[in-house]
Amino acid sequence: MRIISYRAVREFKQKHPLASVALDRWYETVAEAEWASFLDVRLFDNSVDYVGDNRYVFNITRNFRLVAMVFFAPQLVYIRFIGTHTEYDRTDVTTV
């Protein structure tokens, strides 16, 4: 998959160093993936949630969430939000 918005990952890691290793692992694994469907995403991470309009919520360690739009045909993952669980709870992830 090609991931768009690495800048968001880099900036979040600077603010939240505890998430750094997990975000790097997520990024590297997704970059190597070739997802064709939600089932493939679920095989990667069985806790991922589909929230509509191509948006998926990934748990990054215990306290961090990443919302990305996944487009299977062109093999694109567009990061829309990275935040703490508290920030995630205050965000309408269906519109980010």
Feature map (PLM): residue ranges:
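Basic, Lys/Arg-enriched alpha-helical interface segments
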Residues: M1-F64, F71-Y78, I82-V96
